[in-house]
UniProtKB/Swiss-Prot annotation:
Residues 38-50 have a biased composition (Basic and acidic residues). Residues 1-57, 367-396, 1302-1356 are annotated as: Disordered. This is Ciliary rootlet coiled-coil protein 2. Keywords: Coiled coil. It comes from Homo sapiens (Human).
């Protein structure tokens, strides 16, 4: 039983260990490899027992260990001894320890390799970090140095700009002072011209007074006192003029000396600056060329080195990137092996634990404790429990073997934990190394990118600097060539100037001869004037008319000469403008060619820049080399920037010098041309004077024959005037265009004052001589202008008093405008300086921004270079992983190569630093020289400025004195004008009575006069739009003439006002004489100032003065252009007026003929007086004429071209101006009539207002009368009541009387009653006070008190009868008074109604008059249309004449254009000379040949002009046609007579209206005295209404007539309503009176019946 039972037990036991073995093996594999281990983990190999055992996989090794342990055991394990098991366990433990040691060795090897990789990575990262830090430090240093250099450059630029701005300000101040002086001179010239005109007018007035005094002496009414006063005034004026002349000459001499000193100082300063600039430019150009050559060599050497270093560094970087990649791969593999080993260890530990547990269990079972169950194998094999082995069994129950086993397991477990910790730390190290590698790669990549970008930017900058230096070299060469050309041109100009000197000497001789001839001519003219005065006293009115026409012809001839001179000046301006335009075009072409060359060079430079950029991108890959090169390049860049700035400044200076030289050459050519033209003009003027003298002698004999031919040639002259105006317009347009071109050129010329070379002294001498010639020409022109002004002054008349006042105001306004313009010019220049400073600041800011951008771009390029280097470094790390063994050798070699390169770069840096220091020293020396020169210049300029300021202060003092005198003159003129206005207001107050009958007519005239006033204001305000305003004035004149024709019959009474106007004119003459004295003083002062200015101008020999004289010429041309425009507009206006006068105003001109004759007589008297004054002033004029003769001798040759056309234009314009003067006289007369009409208008408007006030007063009176009627009616009602009461009382009295009589005579039986019942008495006594209270006005008239009915006797009754009689008498008186008042009120109503009817009649007449005026306006508009048709036909005829003149002008223009084309061709040749620098000799010869050709062409042109003069001689016969204008004058006289008749009739009507108004005023005063208290409110209200209506009428004048008509209609309606009310009131009064009478009769009848009963 026991055996049987034991066998199954054994079988179960044997099966259980087999199953447990498989599970234990599986669990060991799971614990070592983990259940989810991959195939690769399970394929891990482990060496078997012994050193030479082959590696086997971990699962197989586990099975081998388990199989070996099982094979060593005997088949009966139950009986084995514990010692054998312990030995096996120890062996297995030893095997496991060996495996653990082997794994530890592997781990140590892996950790060693990992440490080695980590150390290598650290070394590489440290190297990269060191390189990055070095590159960053180098970049920072380069940036700091660059910023420092930029700051230094900016500081130098600012200093240079400040100096340049200082010089510019000095130059601007000098220019401003010169411009102010010029403006002051011009203003003084204008004032002198105005003063001379006023002096001449005053001389004419003095001559008229002398003639009048002579007549009065001949008639026995001489006034010696007036003559003595006049002579004393003339002597005072002469002394004042002499003093003013001396003072002005003295002041101008001082000013001239000061200006000459300043000019010399400026000239020397400019010369010093020019020499310094030239020296600095030459030295800097040479040094820059050498530096550029050195830099080019260094750059080529550096480029080669950079190429070699780039290749080596690229190879190293690729190797290092490979090494890095290999290391990363190895690290990954090692991490994998470590993870596999870790799993193996875990599996082995688990297997050992399981085996130990099984052995412990088996040993325990063998020791005889089978009942004690084992712990579940799951708990033993769980890894969590494996971490806590002491919990398996208590230590008390285990034997020492088990304890040893447990200790071994614990040791393995601890070792395993240590290994796990080491693995974790190694993985963390690997991750950190990978992150460091990635960061180092990124940093390397960024550093490579930055270095590449910086290298590219530096290459670009280097190329740009090279291009700039090359461009500057070219510009320097061009400037040198231009200087050479200018020197040659200067020599040619000197030759031309010498020739001109000879011509000028000849012209001076001719001028002296002409002066003598002019003096003789003046003497002959004076003798002729005296003869004319004698003949004027003897001849009749026809001879006087002929003399006036002769004077006008002389004036026309003078104007023709003035126009000729103006045309010549205009042509000179045109020629100068063409020359300047050609010069500008040549300069533009040169600039275009230079720009084309610059563009080509820029294209080449761009190609070079691109190539160098591509090379530079390749040259910047090494970090160490880049650091040193960056330093060198930054320093080189700063040095090159400084050099570039200096070269740019020098280039600008050279350009400015070239421009100034070219402009001076052009100006010299222009001045030569102008001098030639002036010579020709002077010759032509001399010939013109000779011919004028001949014509004067001929005209004196042919005046009567020419008077008949003037009318025929009128139309031809008008057409010719139209053609002349067209030509003038064309010339004006050309002038405007030339002026614009000249202004544009002046802007460029103003910038040329900074650079002057050594040629300026000689050129200044030549210019001084030319300026002397030009001044002589200008003096001659001014003297001729003065002569013209003196001749034109004979045209002044009595009606020019207001014009003189307005002229004075205009002169003052012009002075204020000139001062305002000067202020504006100063403000503009200040603004320009500010704008220039702002532009410079903007440029500096842009430069700084550009530099910042460049720095940023360099930084970006450096970052890109670093990034590219980082990429390359990654590749190098990958290569390092592949080539681990050769890395140390290559690194050593590379270090050696890098050291060599660094040493070489350091040597280069030292060399470049030495060169840079040398360049800096040179630059500093140059800067010091330049600063010293600039300081000297600034000092000199400050001295010149101080002198100029003193001069300016003196001038300002003189100007202030002149202004004070002008203000004093203006105040006196204003006071005189106020006196004249007071006299005029006194006369106008006498004419205020004209308002009653001419309301509508004067409103129409008021509209016309307001339109004229507005047009005149527009003329004064808008001088540029003269033609349209002239047309408007013509239309208004036609309207005024038509209005005068319509009012011809009504204006017969104007003769009386005319006498008043004559008195006012005499007073105005006196005021004008006073003003003339003051103006003479100012004229003398201005003439002396002008003389001193001319002397000052003669001594100014600088370039600035020539420029100012050109500006003066431009101003003269502008003034001439404005004068031409004004004369053209005046001629157009005169033509229109002539056509209108020829169409519609013939009858009026016939009427005005008589007045024209009288005016002719007055003009003759004035001419006589003017000749007397002219004889006194002849001595002063002789000197001026001598100078004029000299100028004419100089201008004689040039005037041959234009003489024929000028004569023709002069004749045409003279005829037009003569007729225009006549029309101006007619205009003046019409203006005088307009003034009278305005006075009448004002008076009529006042009368209208008075009439409206009268109407309102009448209406108020009517209202008062109505109120009075109502009060009378009330009084009548009260009187009726009182009468009824009285009648009742009378009835009662009668009854009492009858009763009393009856008692005495008939009825003794009557009761002795009282006379009235007490009841009645009480009633009556009670009623009467009530009545009295209701009618207080009746109380004074009824003083009775009714007696009480006391019983009495006969005496009381008699007393009652007496009182009744008194009461009746009072009542009758009151009734009579009421009737009288009623009759008076009726009479007043009748008078008021009659006055209202008269006012209505007047309104009706005014309305009819308005209708007549409207008809007249319509007829005037029709006449205007007819005139427009006639004008269109006249324009067509004038167009034909224009074509003839145009053909002649075209021939002249063709010659001028040929000359201009030849000049242009010469300028083109000059440009070719500029471009061909090497062929200077041939070009100089060509210039000489071209000068000869020019002289030949000028001679040809003179011959052509002479031919043109011969062809234009028939046109001179046009002068004979001016005599036809006398017929127009006769017609004007007839029309004036008609106007006088109409004025007489108008005066008569005005007198009648005045008488009527006086009567009305007397009646109104009588009525107003009765009703003043009640009418005050109504009149005040009505006056306010009228004031508002008047303001509204002034605000809306076209609606004035409608408003007046509506007001009149409302007045009529009101009057009608009042009349109707009065009539109704009358009817009511009559009805009430009748009713009351009937009622009274009825009551009386009833009382009678009652008493009878």
């Amino acid at each position: 039983m026991s055996s049987a039972s034991s066998e199954p037990g054994n079988g179960d036991a044997s099966q259980q260990p087999l199953l447990g073995l498989d599970t234990v093996i599986q669990r060991l594999e799971d614990t070592i490899l983990s259940p989810t281990a991959s195939r690769e983990d399970r394929a891990l190999t482990v060496r078997g027992e012994g050193r030479q055992a082959s590696p086997t996989p971990v699962p197989t090794r586990i099975r081998e260990i388990v199989a070996g342990s099982l094979s060593e055991e005997p088949p009966q394990a139950g009986v084995q001894e514990p010692t054998a098991t312990v030995a096996r366990v120890q062996e297995e433990n030893e095997l496991l320890q060996e495996e653990l040691t082997r794994l530890g060795d592997l781990l140590a090897q892996a950790s060693a390799e990992r440490d080695e990789l980590a150390s290598r990575c650290r070394v590489v990262s440290e190297q990269l970090q060191a390189r990055l830090e070095t590159t960053e430090a180098q970049l920072r240093r380069s940036e700091l140095e660059h910023s420092v250099d930029l700051e230094e450059a900016l500081g130098r630029l600012e200093a240079a700009e400040e100096r340049s701005t200082g010089l510019c300000q000095v130059n601007a101040l000098l220019r401003e002072q010169l411009e102010h002086m010029k403006k002051a001179n011009d203003a003084l010239g204008r004032e002198l011209a105005g003063m001379t005109g006023s002096v001449q007018r005053l001389q004419g007035e003095l001559e008229l007074r002398r003639w009048a005094q002579r007549q009065t002496r001949s008639g026995g009414l001489g006034q010696p006192r007036d003559l003595l006063l006049l002579w004393r005034q003339a002597v005072v004026l002469g002394t004042d003029l002499a003093e003013l002349r001396v003072a002005t000459e003295r002041g101008l001499a001082d000013l001239q000396a000061d200006t000459a000193r300043t000019a010399r100082r400026l000239h020397t300063a400019c010369l010093n600056l020019d020499s310094n600039l030239r020296l600095s430019a030459s030295s800097t150009a040479s040094t820059l060329g050498q530096q550029l050559r050195d830099k080019a060599g260094e750059m080529l050497q550096l480029q080669g080195r950079w190429d070699a270093e780039k290749v080596a560094l690229q190879a190293r970087l690729s190797e290092q990137t490979l090494l890095v990649e290999k290391l990363t791969e190895q690290n990954e593999q090692k991490a994998k092996t470590i993870a596999a080993l870790r799993t193996d260890l875990q599996n082995l530990v688990a297997q050992e634990d399981a085996r130990c547990l099984e052995l412990a269990g088996s040993s325990i079972t063998e020791l005889g404790e089978p009942r004690r169950p084992l712990r579940s194998p799951q708990r033993a094999t769980s890894p969590h429990q494996g971490a806590s082995p002491p919990h398996i069994c208590s230590p008390a129950t285990l034997d020492p073997a088990l304890q040893a086993m447990r200790a071994a397991i614990e040791r393995r477990w601890r070792r395993e934990q240590e290994l796990c910790l080491q693995l974790k730390s190694s993985q963390a190290l690997v991750a950190s190394l990978q992150e460091q590698l990635s960061e180092s790669r990124r940093e390397l990549w960024a550093a490579q990118k930055l270095q590449q970008e910086r290298a590219r930017e530096q290459a670009r900058e280097r190329e740009a600097l090279r291009g700039q230096l090359e461009a500057q070299r070219l510009e320097v060469q061009q400037c040198r060539a231009s200087c050479k050309l200018l020197g040659r041109e200067k020599a040619a100009l000197e030759m031309v100037v010498e020739e001109l000197k000879g011509k000028a000497d000849a012209a001076d001789a001719e001028k002296q001869g002409l002066e003598a001839e002019a003096a003789e001519l003046q003497r002959s003219l004076l003798l002729q004037a005296e003869r004319r005065e004698e003949l004027a006293l003897r001849r009749e009115r026809s001879c006087r008319a002929l003399e006036t026409s002769q004077g006008r012809l002389q004036q026309l001839e003078e104007k023709v000469s003035g126009l000729r001179e103006e045309l010549a000046s205009v042509r000179e301006a045109l020629s100068t403008a063409q020359l300047q335009r050609d010069v500008v075009e040549s300069e533009r072409e040169g600039l275009r060619s230079a720009l084309a060359r610059a563009e080509c060079s820029n294209a080449d430079l761009e190609l070079l820049v691109r190539r160098l950029k591509s090379e530079g991108v390749e040259q910047r890959d090494s970090l160490a080399a880049m650091a040193a090169l960056m330093e060198g390049l930054a320093q080189d860049k700063s040095a090159l920037n400084h050099l570039a700035l200096q070269l740019e400044q020098e280039r600008d200076q050279l350009r400015e010098q070239r421009k100034t030289l070219e402009q001076e050459r052009a100006r010299a050519g222009e001045q030569l041309a102008q001098a030639e033209q002036q010579l020709a003009l002077e010759r032509a003027e001399r010939r013109g004077l000779q011919q004028a003298c001949g014509r004067l002698e001929q005209r004196q004999e042919q005046l009567e024959g020419q008077a008949a031919l003037l009318g025929r040639e009128k139309a031809q002259l008008q057409e010719q005037v139209g053609q002349v105006t067209c030509q003038k317009q064309a010339l004006e347009e050309q002038l405007a265009q030339s002026l614009q071109d000249q202004e544009a050129q002046m802007g460029t010329l103003q910038q040329a004052l900074q650079g002057k070379d050594a040629l300026s002294e000689e050129r200044a001498q030549l210019l001084a001589k030319q300026e002397a010639l030009e001044r002589q020409g200008r003096l001659a022109a001014e003297e001729a202008a003065d002569l013209r002004v003196e001749r034109d002054s004979l045209e002044s008349s009595l009606l020019e008093a207001q014009q003189l006042a307005t002229k004075l105001q205009e002169q003052l306004e012009e002075e204020a405008r000139s001062a305002g313009l000067a202020r504006q010019a100063l403000q503009v220049e200040m603004e320009q300086l500010q704008s220039d400073w702002e532009v410079q600041e903007m440029k500096l800011r842009q430069d700084t921004v550009r530099l910042q951008r460049q720095v940023a771009q360099q930084e970006r390029e450096a970052q890109r270079a670093l990034e590219s280097q980082a990429l390359a470094h990654r590749e190098a790390l990958a290569q390092l992983q592949r080539e681990k063994e050769t890395l140390s050798l290559t690194l050593a070699e590379e270090k050696e190569v890098a050291r060599c390169q660094l040493e070489q770069e350091k040597e280069l840096v030292t060399k470049s630093a030495a060169e840079r220091e040398a360049l800096k020293g040179e630059i500093q020396s140059l800067k010091q020289e330049r600063d010293e020169s600039l300081l000297q210049l600034e000092h000199k300029m400050q001295q010149a400025l101080s002198l100029k300021e003193t001069e300016r202060s003196l001038l300002s003092e003189e100007l202030s004195r002149a202004r004070r005198t002008l203000e004093r003159v203006q105040q006196e003129a204003q006071s005189q004008q106020e006196q004249a206005q007071a006299t005029i207001s006194a006369t106008t107050e006498e004419l205020k009575a004209l308002q009653a009958q001419f309301e509508d007519a004067i409103t129409a005239h008021q509209r016309e006069t307001t339109a004229l006033r507005e047009s005149l204001q527009d003329l004064a305000a808008e001088r540029g739009d003269v033609e349209r305003e002239a047309e408007r004035l013509r239309a208004q004149l036609t309207v005024a003439q038509e209005g005068l024709a319509a009012l011809r019959q009504e204006l017969q009474g104007v003769e009386e006002s005319r006498e008043g106007l004559h008195r006012e004119a005499q007073e105005a003459r006196r005021a004008l004489s006073d003003e003339a004295r003051e103006k003479d003083v100012l004229l003398l002062f201005n003439s002396e100032l002008r003389a001193t200015i001319c002397r000052a101008e003669q001594e100014k020999a600088s370039f600035k003065r020539s420029k100012e004289e050109k500006e003066q010429k431009l101003l003269i041309l502008e003034e001439a252009q404005a004068a031409l425009q004004q004369e053209a507009s005046a001629l157009r206006a005169h033509l229109w007026e002539l056509e209108q006068a020829g169409g519609d105003a013939r009858q009026e001109l016939r009427e005005l003929h008589r007045q024209v004759r009288t005016l002719k007589a007055e003009n003759q008297r004035r001419s006589g007086e003017a000749h007397e004054l002219q004889a006194q002033c002849s001595q002063e004029v002789l000197e001026l004429r001598r100078q004029a003769a000299k100028a004419e001798a100089k201008h004689e040759g040039a005037r041959k071209e234009v003489l024929g056309l000028q004569r023709k234009l002069a004749e045409v314009e003279a005829a037009g101006e003569a007729h225009g003067q006549r029309l101006q006289e007619h205009l003046r007369e019409s203006r005088g009539a307009e003034q009278t009409l305005r006075a009448e208008l004002h008076s009529v408007t006042r009368k209208l207002q008075e009439a409206s006030g009268v109407a309102d007063a009448l209406q108020a009176r009517l209202d008062q009368a109505c109120h009075r009627i109502h009060s009378l009616e009330q009084e009548l009602a009260q009187a009726e009541g009182a009468r009824q009461d009285a009648e009742a009382q009378l009835g009662r009295l009668c009854s009492t009387l009858r009763r009393g009589l009856g008692l005495q005579r008939q009825s003794p039986w009557a009761s002795p009653e009282q006379p009235g019942s007490p009841t009645k008495g009480s009633d009556s006594s009670q009623a009467l006070p009530g009545q009295q209270g209701t009618s207080p006005p009746a109380r004074p008239h009824s003083p009775l008190r009714w007696p009480s009915p006391t019983p009495g006797g006969r005496s009381s009754e008699l007393m009652d009868v007496a009182t009744v009689q008194d009461i009746l008498r009072d009542f009758v008186q009151k009734l009579r008074e009421a009737q009288r008042e009623r009759d008076d009120s009726r009479i007043q109503m009748a008078t008021l109604s009659s006055r209202l009817s008269e006012a209505e009649c007047r309104c009706a007449r005014a309305q009819s008059r308005v209708g007549q005026l409207q008809k007249a306006l319509a007829e005037a508009e029709e006449g205007q249309r007819r005139v427009e048709g006639a004008l269109s036909s006249a324009r067509a005829a004038r167009a034909l004449q224009k074509e003839a003149l145009r053909r002649l002008e075209l021939e002249h223009l063709a010659s001028v254009r040929a000359a201009g084309q030849e000049k242009r061709r010469l300028q083109e040749q000059l440009e070719t000379l500029r471009q061909a620098l090497e062929e200077s000799r041939r070009h100089s010869q060509g210039l000489a040949k071209q000068g000869k050709l020019l002289e030949e062409q000028l001679t040809n042109l003179e011959h052509r002009c002479q031919k043109a003069e011969v062809s234009l001689e028939p046109l001179r016969q046009m002068e004979q046609e001016t005599l036809k204008r006398e017929e127009d004058v006769a017609r004007l006289g007839a029309e004036k007579e008609q106007l006088d008749q109409s004025l007489n009739s108008l005066h008569q009507e005005v007198d009648g209206a005045l008488r009527q108004n006086q009567q009305l005023q007397a009646q109104m005063t009588e009525m107003e005295q009765a009703h003043t208290q009640r009418l005050q409110d109504l009149t005040a209200q009505h006056q306010r209404d009228l004031a508002t209506e008047a303001e509204r009428l002034h605000g809306a004048r076209p609606q004035a007539t409608q408003a007046l008509e509506s007001q009149e209609w409302t007045h009529q309606q009101q009057v009608k309503v009042l009349e109707e009310q009065v009539a109704s009131l009358k009817e009511q009064l009559d009805q009430e009176v009748q009713w009351r009478q009937q009622a009274h009769l009825g009551q009386a009848f009833q009382t009678g019946h009652a008493q009878r009963d």
